[in-house]
Amino acid sequence: MKEYSFSSIDSDLAAKCHELNEKNVPNVGSRSLEGLTNSIENSDYNEAIVFQNNVIGFVVCFQDNENTIKYMHEIKHKNFNEIEHRVSNFLYIDRIAVDSHYRKSRLGTSLYENTLKFAKNNFIKYLTAEINLLPYVNQP
């Protein structure tokens, strides 16, 4: 059985998350290393899955609190700012990615479950996310 570790994303892991992020474009938006690192540092919840010293999955989320709202307005985050006008007490899943070699192993499910646990522990009522339907449609 494979031994995966789950941890918060530190500066060492941020570069590895960036590599994985760029491998997952266009399913997630492209970001510069500096931009992704800045997002991770300002996020309210983040987590990486590490296997054999490689990041094979990660999630970055933002809660609608005062500091995050200020940050999201500063970077002009279109989706978060739109959701903020419609819902309150939410956690926005900004990006989630799993390495293509490790899909169908329930790792994405684990990231979502851990995100949900964070939301419940912090009395957050809603989970929100942008869903990209194109260029791919998931096939069961």
What do these predicted regions represent?
Residues M1-C17:
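A short beta-loop-alpha structural element at the N-terminal edge
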Residues V98, K104-K117:
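Conserved acetyl-CoA-binding loop-helix of GNAT-fold acetyltransferases
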Residues L134-P140:
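Short, flexible/disordered intra-domain loops and linkers
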Residues V60-R95:
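Conserved acyl-donor/pantetheine-binding loop and adjacent beta-alpha core of acyl/acetyltransferases
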Residues K2, N53-F58, L91:
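Glycine-rich phosphate/pyrophosphate-binding loop shared by adenosine-nucleotide-utilizing enzymes
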Residues K16-L20, G35, N54, S110, ...:
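Alpha-helical elements of Rossmann-like donor-binding domains used by nucleotide-donor carbohydrate transfer enzymes
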Residues A119-L134:
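Conserved GNAT acetyl-CoA-binding A-motif
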Residues P26-Q52, F58-E66:
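Active-site rim helix/loop that mediates acceptor-substrate recognition in acyltransferases
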